[in-house]
Amino acid sequence: MMELAGQSAAELPDDEVFSLLKKGKTTLCYDGQNFFDTDHPVFEKVDGTGNQTTQVNLTVGTDNDAPTFYIVDTRLPIKPLIWQKRTAPEIEPKFDPAKSEHVFMEDEYLWGVRARGAAGFGFWQLIHRVEKTKLTKENVQKVIQTMKGLKGDGGKALNIQPNLILVPTNLEYAAKELFKTKQINGTTNILESELDVLASPFINE
């Protein structure tokens, strides 16, 4: 039981971060848009003034059966999603009947794990959500090129270099075939090693 409690505490950051990730289409980020959106504002001048254009980090196709996946740049100190640890996990027992009605009435000790933290959004530019879109070479290349072309205010190139694809578990082997094999159907696979693959049950839908 204590091992399970410890495991649950260790998984708390993943649970919170990925839960927030799945809410990104309906949760605002620092620029006033939903974190995943098709119209993030970018301004002509570096001070945030001048003509406004928009950029995207959301692709929505028409294939309702295609699982959602994400392409991410994790290289930089700032991340697309952030976990702030406030209190490290620690076992917290209740032994004293003077302080616990349950211990007093039932003569049973209680054990738990206490931890505190919070998940939040970082830079939307570092992650792209792809939904209702098949995981294919062509679709991945489009997203990667979109991310690499992102600019900040004043037209500054952001040098986004995606290095990870985050997939639900039912896309794990398809993603590994796309990024971990030298050939596909007898043809050189130009996407080999382009992205690392991370499959997580926390984003299964």
Regions found by a protein language model. Name each.
Residues 1-26, 103-116, 165:
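Long, contiguous amphipathic alpha-helices that act as assembly "spine/axial" helices in icosahedral shell
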